[in-house]
Amino acid sequence: MSSIVIVSGSRTAMGGFQGSLSSLTAPELGAAVIRESIQRAGVKPEQVDEVIFGCVLSAGIGQAMRKAGVPDHVGAVTINKLCGSAMKAVLMASDTLKAGSANIIVAGGMESMTNAPYILPKARGGYRMGHGEIKDHMFLDGLEDAETGRLMGSFAQDMANTKGFTREQMDDFAISSLKKAQTAITEGYFKEEIVPVEVKTRKGVEVVDQDEQPLKANLEKIPTLRPAFSKDGTITAANSSSISDGAAALVLTTEEYAQSHGLNTLAKIVATSTHSQHPSEFTIAPISAIQKVLERAGWSVDEVDAWEINEAFAMVAMAPIHELGIDEAKVNVHGGACALGHPIGATGSRIILSLIYALKRLGKKKGVAALCIGGGEATAVAIEI
């Protein structure tokens, strides 16, 4: 069976909540990276067999592939696996290619958390009289547990307590992430992966081509921030990921197709995994997902040259580092979501793309990307360049 390869990819800069990308919808962000990734792959839009894209907050947003100029005959599907949506899109693309059901698939994710609407649950039937309720789509379908209504961060706080991670440890991890991201931005490490996006403002058209939040952060304030999820808690806005806007796409095909059509290969997908446990334990689910993907790849922890473990909360990345003996210096080498942000439907493909370019810059070969998913799940991908 021919291996599955990634032949191109791109992402937008990560925009802050109500920040630089706030005037663009998720499909507009998605269209930018779909269009750019197809162009970078050196294929024509009509050669694409399917677009598989993640998006969590999809109420009323429309379609990205149409805005990207992909022809009408190309199929498309939207994936909602919460924070794992974009990585699941990549996993589904890989499986579809393995089955021989397609030759070229664009996979990734998009999210404009800024533009997530508010919902009127009883509007269709009529409120008749009395007080009504407006629900926040972002909270209801993105940041809250479906069964209990608790915020995801409250579960992270519980697990941080269970694992004994202190405020100082999590703040130090977040500060390290922020410093790495700031260095990556100032040194231009992200330039290859980012597609500039034009945004219309009152002053004219502005080009957004740099992650918005890391250079705005004040390192000195991090230890002074109030707990976010409990009065005496240790998790804060700084050692958590920030609400963000962005998109990332990858073009996948088989190694055989790439070779026969003269396409350059960025990376090969060596193995994938999905893991689930109790919903309250989603923050440590990446540990088992990583173990599974390493077993399937036939790799040891020490053989992996670089890791992208999504920092939904600092403790999510810290847990596998401690449990599996991962060298922290190899994790999120250009910073993670505590610094860059976490547009929930896009992060899964963003971290794969960033991992590819980190390996490329470092002259290394093997990498693993993993993230936690609300509901108790996690996914992981092992790649080789």
Feature names for model-found ranges:
Residues 10-12, 23-32, 40, 169-260, ...:
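N-terminal extracellular/periplasmic Venus flytrap/periplasmic-binding protein-like
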Residues 1-27, 36, 219-284, 288, ...:
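Condensing-enzyme catalytic core mediating Claisen C-C bond formation in acyl metabolism
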Residues 1-68, 75, 155-167, 177, ...:
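Conserved active-site "lid/cap" helical segment
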Residues 52-53, 155-157, 193, 200, ...:
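Active-site pocket-lining segment
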Residues 79-111, 160-189, 249-256, 321, ...:
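Active-site-proximal alpha-helical scaffold in enzymes
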Residues 104-159:
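Flexible glycine-/small-residue-enriched beta->alpha junction loops
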